[in-house]
Amino acid sequence: MVLKDFDKNLEKYAKLLVSTGINVQPGHTVNIVIDVDQAPLARLLVKEAYAHGASEVIVSWADDFVGRERLLHAAEDRISNVPEYRVAEMNYLLEKKASRLNVRSADPDAFAGVSAERLQKSTKALSLALKPLRTATQANKVSWTVASAAGKEWAKKVFPNAATDEEAVDLLWDQIFKTCRVYADDPVAAWKEHEEKLDAKASILNKEQFVKLHYTAPGTDLTLGMPKNHVWESAGSINAQGEHFIANMPTEEVFSAPDFRVAEGYVSSTKPLSYNGNIIEGIKVTFKDGQITEVSAEKGDKVMKDLVFENNGARGLGEVALVSDPSPISQSGITFFNTLFDENASNHLAIGSAYATSVKGGENFETEEELREAGLNRADVHVDFMIGGPEMNVDGIREDGTVVPIFRNGDWAI
């Protein structure tokens, strides 16, 4: 590694993820999901979590190679079922109210060439088996943070013209540190200032309580309904124990959930989507009566269609997020082939399940039917795809029909 002060900045990054991301408190159980190639960062995270008083730190190792070999060669009945020990681990983490830190560094093409049918079977089985964990996460019952680390294959995809693999990894780490404000003299203070700016936009939108949003851009003319008493959130969240955490690092978004029963028109993607080890590009989606009626992709069409039509609830939307086109990630001009980064360069929507916190009091609803009645989609998946750009306009429509500009030419107008 030749990146200047890399070890120092990696340690700062670990401290930031633990203290400001999942905000580890004395007595917490912590679950870190991380790739085997990122062991040095994992060890720093474990050390830092215990330094903050964690009672237990559990590391769940991931490996693209192992995952690919399983999908290619494992017996069919093993692909479509989840081992009991995975469910037992999930139940243990839920019982302990474990904070979850997911550090992603996967190869965007890890599962390219794998049978779409086998991939879909595996994804669906895992989604169903781990649904209680997803439900708890989407209701902020626990603290959770998604972050990234520079994996070699991912770095080579983002920086194909780098002279060496090491240079590509350095370039990607540099972007991770920049966008996560690690280079600031005081990263924690820098994040607090950033949160305040995003909170100001969320506050305006929450006061307005628009009944509809109207998106227009080349290839897009889409109207979405908004639930009654919807809530716009930004960087920071509060878990069921009253503890602050940041779900995504980096983040530039202000987000809520649309009413899944009201969506009319069409929308086109503006960035590639990395989903299940496949790259999907040129996505076009048509909505009628709140549901996706048609979907296509120039690349990854089969994977995209399976995502929408083979997963329960995936024909509806679960998230609407506003991101200024002049955001630092967008202005970098880099396509990261990683949703965590690319969604923070662009307005985006999410296919599938909504966060319970997107309506007032939703985190306290006890049944999925209550959430549906409030307009929140329930599904087995939640997958963001990017639709924003410098030509996008977004209008808010009040109950009396008044149209209020929210975005003009890809930037905030409120």
Indicate residue ranges for each PLM-predicted region.
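Active-site bordering "gate/hinge" segments
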Residues: M1-E264, G396, T402-V404, W412-I414
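Glycine-rich, charged/polar anion/phosphate-binding loops
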Residues: L130-P132, L198-A200, Q209-V211, T251-V254, ...
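A short, compositionally biased
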Residues: L205-V211, I279-E281, M386-N393
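Short linear motifs in exposed loops
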Residues: G225, V295-S296, F407
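Long, well-ordered mid-to-C-terminal structural blocks that present hydrophobic/aromatic surfaces
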Residues: S256-N312
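A structural signal for short secondary-structure junctions
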Residues: F260-R261, N276-N278, T286-F287, N311-R315, ...
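Dual-mode signal for accessory low-complexity, basic/Gly-rich regions
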Residues: I292-E363
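Extended hydrophobic packing segments that form well-structured cores
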Residues: E368-I414
